Amino acid sequence: MGPVRLGILLFLFLAVHEAWAGMLKEEDDDTERLPSKCEVCKLLSTELQAELSRTGRSREVLELGQVLDTGKRKRHVPYSVSETRLEEALENLCERILDYSVHAERKGSLRYAKGQSQTMATLKGLVQKGVKVDLGIPLELWDEPSVEVTYLKKQCETMLEEFEDIVGDWYFHHQEQPLQNFLCEGHVLPAAETACLQETWTGKEITDGEEKTEGEEEQEEEEEEEEEEGGDKMTKTGSHPKLDREDL
């Protein structure tokens, strides 16, 4: 077996082993894997603020009310400040939470983000290379919302129902404040439970609490390119430990 092929096999083994080890570590306490109230509020406010930002520039004017016999005219209300805009933004708001994935390689609330997780991308890459990966479910179901994300969605619905009047108050009277601050810090969470609101994704991978340097990132990219070039030559199918999809 040549050194390049041996290196590829070693990389594949370490990739699966790293993902598996991280999952086993979190399986010790299932409650730690459930989203916190802070995380639910953060995602709820993020999604609503984003939807309102998307529709905020509309110049549409709504005609409200009916023309009465008295001759009273309909009211003209800009869509950008109308109740209709808020109602449309709230419609299916929590359904959009199902677009999120669990990124087990990230910490805290950054664990929840849209798009495919790094771990899942790695595992799919292994499958494409012919490596057998067992998540306990068919391959075609890998991209379905996980139990954790489904729980997020249900908690979003519960929170929205409970604080819908507060959201309305913010929309009509307090939009000078970020919704996250007004809703989560001001009404939903105790002061001691707001830490997740300060967590921000920088787009850089975090290892042991420190960001990787540019040199380290470039070195890893070069190594990955070399491994991918050699990976095209692989045809063998390996056997690896069964993984838990909930932490991908």
Swiss-Prot record:
Keywords: Disulfide bond, Secreted, Signal. Residues 231-248 have a biased composition (Basic and acidic residues). Pfam families: DUF3456. GO terms for molecular function: signaling receptor binding. Disulfide bonds join 38-196, 41-184, 94-156. Plays a role in the regulation of the cell surface expression of TLR4. Residues 1-21 form the signal peptide. Residues 213-230 have a biased composition (Acidic residues). This is Protein canopy homolog 4. Coiled coil: none annotated. The gene is CNPY4. Its main location: secreted. It comes from Homo sapiens.
